[in-house]
Amino acid sequence: MLKPLGDRVVLKIEEKEEKVGGFVIAGNSHAATKTATVVAVGQGVRTLTGELVAPSVKAGDKVLVESHAGVEVKDGEETYLLVSEANILAIVE
């Protein structure tokens, strides 16, 4: 399992398929945002005074993330997206 550092967050993207004229199009290929589930969260970042600022998200949260943000990584058979917390736009409730 991936353990993110600092303010980084590991996400599992929810893939949606869309059919147009019999062709399957990746659902997120043209969207500005993606929906994802938080898998793991780093400890946060430190301020200039050394105070630790904890992340706003936690494992299990469903979030909205910028479409082209982060780095795709593989862990075994699973593919995850590793992003900075700043790339997460909202928690979906």
Curated annotation (Swiss-Prot):
Keyword entries, A-Z: Chaperone, Cytoplasm
GO molecular function, one term: unfolded protein binding
GO CC term (a single one): cytoplasm
Cellular compartments annotated: Cytoplasm
PROSITE patterns for the chain: CHAPERONINS_CPN10 (PS00681)
An example Gene Ontology biological process: chaperone cofactor-dependent protein refolding
Endoplasmic reticulum listed as a keyword: no
CDD domains according to UniProt: cpn10
PANTHER family in the cross-refs: 10 KDA HEAT SHOCK PROTEIN, CO-CHAPERONIN GROES
HAMAP family assigned to the protein according to its UniProt record, in alphabetical order: CH10
UniProt similarity note: Belongs to the GroES chaperonin family.
Designated name of the protein: Co-chaperonin GroES
Species in which this protein is naturally found: Streptococcus gordonii (strain Challis / ATCC 35105 / BCRC 15272 / CH1 / DL1 / V288)
Source organism phylogeny: Bacteria, Bacillati, Bacillota, Bacilli, Lactobacillales
UniProt gene name: groES
